[in-house]
Curated annotation (Swiss-Prot):
Its cofactor is Mg(2+). It comes from Mycoplasmoides gallisepticum (strain R(low / passage 15 / clone 2)). Mg(2+) binds at residues 464, 470, 473-474. Its main location: cytoplasm. It is found in: Cytoplasm. One of its GO terms (biological process) is phenylalanyl-tRNA aminoacylation. Keywords: Aminoacyl-tRNA synthetase, ATP-binding, Cytoplasm, Ligase, Magnesium, Metal-binding, Nucleotide-binding, Protein biosynthesis, RNA-binding, tRNA-binding. GO terms for molecular function: ATP binding; magnesium ion binding; phenylalanine-tRNA ligase activity; tRNA binding. The keyword Secreted does not apply. This is Phenylalanine--tRNA ligase beta subunit. Belongs to the phenylalanyl-tRNA synthetase beta subunit family. Type 1 subfamily. Residues 710-804 form the FDX-ACB domain. SMART domains: B3_4 (SM00873), B5 (SM00874).
C-alpha cells in the first residue's frame, strides 16, 4: 500500500515537521511494515509566473506567444503550443510554472533561450510530465497534452513542487491482514498520531445537512445478504470540471489517474476510509437501480473498453434495461460520465468480499475498487464515506442539488466492550510501578478506544480485539517498554547449544565478506509469484501463512535469488552501484527446512568505481571459483555438469554443482526475461544458489547424548575409515548406532587421500576419522577389556565392508 505524507497531514497537520526516519520508526512500531520510501528530487531554475497576455505567433498557427510576469517588474516572453492556452478567458491572470534558462528537467531537456520561427522564447512553460516524467503514466489525456495552470500561487515563488504535491514522501507499506481498516489512512493516522504524540484532527464537519431533495428513482438490494449496504446520493445540475492540481498531485502520488473533479473525489475519499465509490450518469439510468446476483450469462462493455461475460452469482448493479456495473469491481460504459453529464448517481456499497474476490479473479480484473472490496469493510467506514461525500460536495454545490441517502442506516461508534484489570495489564507488561491507571487509559483513548473506568469500548471498525490481552498488544504500540524498570529473570537451568552449524555458516560468511561480497538479510515471506520465481530446485507448493500481514507477505519463499534481485532493483532505482551480495538463510518447504546460500553479481569483482572494467572479470569461471570456495568450506570438492532446463538461467552459460552424484546447487547467468521483472534487463547478472543442508549434515549427522558428570575418566579410541563407492555416510551411522557399548561418537576430521591398499578404487577417496567414547556406567574397564570392545566394533565395521 502507498502511504502519502501529504494525505497523512490532513489528519496529523504537524507531521510535516517530523523526519521521514521517525515516521518509518513509528509505522513499524504500530505494525505497518515499511518496505521502501520514495521522495522526489527538486529542480533549480523553476519559478511561479503569471499569464499577463497571450497572442498568436505571427509565423505559426499552433503556437502562442505568452507574456509571463515572474516578479513585480519583470516580464518574459515564452512560446508554447499547449492547447489550453488557446482559450484566453480561462487562463489569463492564472499562474504557471516556468523553467528558466539553465533548468535541467528530469526528462533530459535543458532549457535555453532560443529563437522559434523568428521570435525569441525565454524559458519553458511546464507540463506535469516535464517535472515528474516517472509518473506520466498516471496522467489523463488532457494533462498529458497541456501545461499546468494554477488558480492560486505566489508570484515569483521558486518552491514550485508544493503546488503539485510533488514535494511529498511516499511510504510503501505492508498492512497486517487483521487491520483492513488501515487501507483507509484516517484509521492508520489515528494510531500513528498516538505513537508520535501528535494531535489528530477529525476532518469531517458536524454541520447539520438540510434542504436535500428526494432521489427520483428507487435503489434496491435484491440479493440474499450479499451486501451490508447498497445505496447512494443523487447530484443534479452540476457541470464537470478539472480538479485542482493539489488534488491531482495527491492522486498521481497514489498511482491513480485524475479524470474530472467528481470522479477524482470518488477516488480521493477511499484513500481516507477504504470504501470505494462509483459515479453513474443518472440521465443514462432507466427506471430503478438494483443490486442483483446474475442468473445467466450476459455481456456488458466495461469502463476499460473491454467486453465481459458475467457468470452466475456475479454481483451486478442493473437498471430496468441493462447492466450498469459489475458491483464493487468495474462500471459499465452504459452509464459512464462524460463532458455532457450534469446529473449523477453516486453509488456507495459494502459488498460481500468473498464474492468480489471470486468475480474479480474469474474476470481477471484488478481495479483499485476490487482490491479494497476484497478486504473486510466495516459499516462504520461506509458511514464515514457518506460524511466525507457530503462535506466535500457541499463546498462545490448548494444543498438543493444533493439528495438524501437512498437508504438510511445507523452504526454505533463502538461495537463491543472489554473488562480490564489494570494490575493484570501492568503485570503482563512487566511494570508494576511505572504505569498508573491514568496513563493506560490515556494511551488507549489515543488509540481510538473509549475508556470508562474498567470498561474499554472497541471502535466499530476494529474486529481484531477480543480480550484484555489484545489491549496490551495495542499498548505496546505506543508505550516505550525500554523505560520500564527491568525485572531480573531467575533461571535454575542452563541450555547447551549445538553451535557447529552456526560456526560453519559464520566462517563461510567471513570468507565471502573478505572477497568484498556484502552479506544481507531479507524477508522470508513474499508473494506467490515471487515465491515460485527462480525456483531452481523445483520445490513444490510454497508454504502459505494463514493470516499474512499482506498479499506480498503471504508465502514462504522457495529461493533467495528473487529477494537479492529485489535488493538490486531498489538500489538501481536510487542509482546506487550494484555490489556483489549474498544471503544465507533456511528455506521452509512442506518437506522441511534447508539452509541455502544465494549470491548475485552484476560487476567485475574487486573493480574500481572509476574503472568498471578493472578487477576480476564477471563470467562463469569467476562464479565457479566462488562456488568452489563455498563447497570447500565444508570439506568437500564438487563436480560441474551442464544444465538441461533453461527456464531461469542461460543454458550455455550455466552449470549445476554435483557432490557424490547429488545436485546441490546451480550457478550461471540469469536470463534477460527474468531480469525484466526487476527492471534489470540491461544488466548481465550471474547468480549462485546452493543447498547447504547436505554439506552441513554430512559432518554434523551424529547423535549427541548428554550425561550427568561422573568421576570416571573418558575412554576413547579414534578410528579412520573409508566407505565403498556405492554407499553413503548413512551406512556407517547405521553400524555405529547398532553398537550399544558406546556412549557417543563424533567426527574429528575429514580429508581426501589415495590409498595404496585400494588398488581397484573400490572405495571413496574421502577418509573419515571418528572418536568413539566407551559407555562406562559404574564399571572401571581394564586395558584388555577396552581393546576387546573396540576390536568388536572394528570387526562389525569390516563385516559391513567399511575399510579401516
Amino acid at each position: 500500500m502507498l502511504l502519502s505524507k501529504k494525505v497523512i497531514a490532513n489528519f496529523i497537520p504537524t507531521i510535516t515537521k517530523i523526519e521521514d526516519k521517525k515516521i518509518v520508526e513509528a509505522l513499524n512500531a504500530i505494525g505497518a511494515e515499511v518496505e521502501s520510501i520514495k521522495t522526489f528530487s527538486m529542480i533549480d531554475y523553476l519559478i511561479i509566473g503569471k499569464i499577463f497576455t497571450i497572442k498568436k505567433h505571427p509565423h505559426a498557427e499552433k503556437l502562442n506567444i505568452c507574456s509571463i510576469q515572474i516578479s513585480d517588474n519583470k516580464f518574459i516572453n515564452i512560446i508554447s503550443d499547449s492547447p489550453n492556452l488557446f482559450d484566453q478567458t480561462k487562463v489569463l491572470n492564472k499562474y504557471v510554472i516556468v523553467a528558466m534558462e539553465g533548468a535541467e528537467l528530469p526528462n533530459g531537456i535543458t532549457v535555453i533561450n532560443r529563437d522559434i520561427r523568428g521570435m525569441n522564447s525565454s524559458g519553458l512553460l511546464c507540463s506535469y510530465a516535464d517535472l515528474n516524467p516517472q509518473s506520466s503514466e498516471y496522467l489523463s489525456e488532457y494533462d498529458s497534452k497541456n501545461i499546468i495552470i494554477l488558480d492560486k500561487a505566489n508570484l515569483g515563488d521558486t518552491e514550485v513542487y508544493k503546488y503539485l504535491n510533488i514535494d511529498d514522501t511516499i511510504f510503501d507499506i505492508s498492512i497486517p491482514s487483521s487491520r483492513p481498516d488501515w487501507h483507509g489512512i484516517r484509521f492508520l493516522a489515528k494510531e500513528l498520531a498516538a505513537y508520535l504524540n501528535l494531535k489528530y484532527v477529525e476532518l469531517i464537519g458536524r454541520a447539520k445537512q438540510t434542504d436535500f431533495h428526494q432521489i427520483n428513482f428507487k435503489v434496491l438490494d435484491e440479493t440474499d445478504n450479499k451486501a451490508k449496504y447498497f445505496g447512494g446520493i443523487h447530484l443534479r445540475n452540476y457541470q464537470l470540471q478539472q480538479s485542482s492540481w493539489n488534488t491531482k498531485g495527491i492522486l498521481i502520488n497514489n498511482h491513480i489517474k485524475p479524470i474530472n473533479d467528481l470522479v477524482d473525489l470518488s477516488n480521493l475519499i477511499p484513500l481516507f476510509v477504504a470504501n470505494p465509490i462509483h459515479i453513474h450518469d443518472a440521465d443514462k439510468i432507466v427506471g430503478d437501480v438494483r443490486l442483483v446476483q446474475a442468473t445467466k450469462k450476459e455481456q456488458f462493455l466495461a469502463l476499460d473498453n473491454k467486453w465481459y461475460t458475467v457468470q452466475e452469482n456475479d454481483l451486478l448493479v442493473v437498471d430496468d434495461e441493462k447492466i450498469i456495473a459489475l458491483a464493487g469491481i468495474i462500471g459499465s460504459m452504459a452509464t459512464a460520465v462524460d463532458e455532457n453529464s450534469i446529473n449523477y448517481f453516486i453509488e456507495v456499497g459494502n459488498f460481500d468480499r468473498h464474492q468480489i474476490i471470486k468475480s474479480a479473479a474469474f474476470h481477471k480484473i484488478n481495479t483499485y475498487s476490487a482490491n479494497l472490496f476484497s478486504k473486510e469493510i466495516s459499516l462504520y467506514q461506509t458511514k464515514k464515506t457518506f460524511e466525507y461525500l457530503y462535506q466535500y460536495l457541499l463546498t462545490k454545490v448548494y444543498n438543493q442539488q444533493l439528495s438524501e441517502l437512498s437508504k438510511t442506516f445507523s452504526v454505533d461508534e463502538y461495537h463491543q466492550q472489554v473488562k480490564v484489570n489494570y494490575d493484570k495489564i501492568r503485570s503482563l507488561l512487566g511494570s508494576m510501578n511505572y504505569l498508573p491507571d491514568a496513563m493506560i487509559q490515556k494511551s488507549l483513548t489515543d488509540l481510538g478506544f473509549l475508556v470508562e473506568d474498567d470498561l474499554v469500548y472497541v471502535p466499530s471498525y476494529r474486529n481484531d480485539i477480543y480480550n484484555w490481552q489484545d489491549l496490551v498488544e495495542e499498548l505496546l504500540k505506543i508505550l516505550n517498554i525500554n523505560l520500564f524498570q527491568p525485572i531480573p529473570i531467575k533461571a535454575d537451568y542452563l541450555l547447551e547449544v549445538n553451535n557447529e552449524t552456526n560456526e560453519l555458516l559464520d566462517r563461510l560468511s567471513k570468507k565471502l565478506r573478505s572477497l568484498k561480497f556484502n552479506h544481507i538479510r531479507t524477508y522470508n515471506l513474499t508473494s506467490k509469484k515471487r515465491a515460485e520465481l527462480l525456483n531452481l530446485f523445483k520445490y513444490q507448493d510454497p508454504v502459505v501463512v494463514s493470516k499474512p500481514i499482506s498479499e506480498t507477505r503471504q508465502y514462504y519463499r522457495q529461493n533467495i535469488l528473487t529477494n537479492l534481485l529485489e535488493v538490486y532493483q531498489l538500489n538501481r532505482s536510487y542509482k546506487n552501484k550494484l555490489y556483489p551480495i549474498f544471503e544465507i538463510q533456511s528455506l521452509l518447504t512442506k518437506n522441511g527446512a534447508n539452509h541455502h546460500i544465494g549470491l548475485v553479481m552484476a560487476n567485475n569483482l574487486f573493480n574500481h568505481s572509476y574503472d568498471p572494467s578493472s578487477g576480476i572479470k564477471l563470467d562463469l569461471i569467476t562464479i565457479k571459483g566462488i562456488s568452489d570456495i563455498i563447497v570447500q568450506n565444508f570439506g568437500f570438492n564438487c563436480n560441474y555438469q551442464t544444465i538441461n532446463d533453461d527456464t531461469y538461467l542461460v543454458k550455455n552459460d550455466s552449470l549445476k554443482l554435483v557432490v557424490y552424484d547429488e545436485t546441490i546447487g546451480y550457478i550461471g547467468k540469469i536470463k534477460k526475461s527474468i531480469l525484466k521483472e526487476f527492471d534489470l534487463a540491461d544488466q548481465d547478472i550471474y547468480c549462485l544458489d546452493i543447498n547447504l543442508e547436505r554439506l552441513i549434515t554430512s559432518i554434523n549427522r551424529y547423535v549427541r547424548t548428554y550425561e550427568a558428570y561422573d568421576h570416571y575418566q573418558e575412554v576413547t579410541r579414534d578410528i579412520t575409515f573409508q566407505l565403498k563407492n556405492e554407499v553413503d555416510f548413512n551406512s556407517f551411522i547405521n553400524v555405529i548406532n547398532s553398537f550399544n557399548k558406546l556412549s557417543k561418537w563424533e567426527i574429528i576430521s575429514i580429508f581426501d587421500a589415495t590409498n595404496q591398499i585400494d588398488t581397484n578404487k573400490t572405495y571413496q577417496p574421502t577418509k573419515y576419522t571418528v572418536r568413539c567414547y566407551l559407555k562406562q556406567g559404574d564399571k572401571t574397564y581394564t586395558t584388555k577389556e577396552i581393546n576387546q570392545i573396540f576390536d568388536e566394533l572394528i570387526d562389525l565395521m569390516k563385516t559391513k565392508q567399511i575399510l579401516i
